[in-house]
Amino acid sequence: MENEVITLLKNMEQQFVEAAINAEKFAEGNNSAGTRVRKAMQNIKNLAQAVRIEVQEQKNKQF
């Protein structure tokens, strides 16, 4: 079974790749892509918080 932290990080990576693609589209003038970039960045922020919580929980279980 894969570690929850690894799963969250892989999801963050996927979100980041999609955000980068949409950032390029936004730079070319597609304003809708800018909205998708902002949404992806919010998702990444939430995933980062989930990673911090999960790491803390796993650390506390060890001791």
Where are each of the predicted segments found?
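Secondary-structure edge/capping motif, primarily at the C-terminal ends of alpha-helices
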Residues: A19, A23-A27, V55-Q58, Q62
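Short amphipathic alpha-helical/adjacent loop interface patches that line ligand
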Residues: F16, M41, A48
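Metal-centered catalytic cores of metalloenzymes
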Residues: N3-I6, V37, A48
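Short, charged, amphipathic alpha-helical segments
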Residues: G34-Q42
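Amphipathic alpha-helical coiled-coil segments
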Residues: I44-E54
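Short, surface-exposed loop/turn segments at secondary-structure junctions
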Residues: A27-T35
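N-terminal acidic leader/helix
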Residues: M1-N22
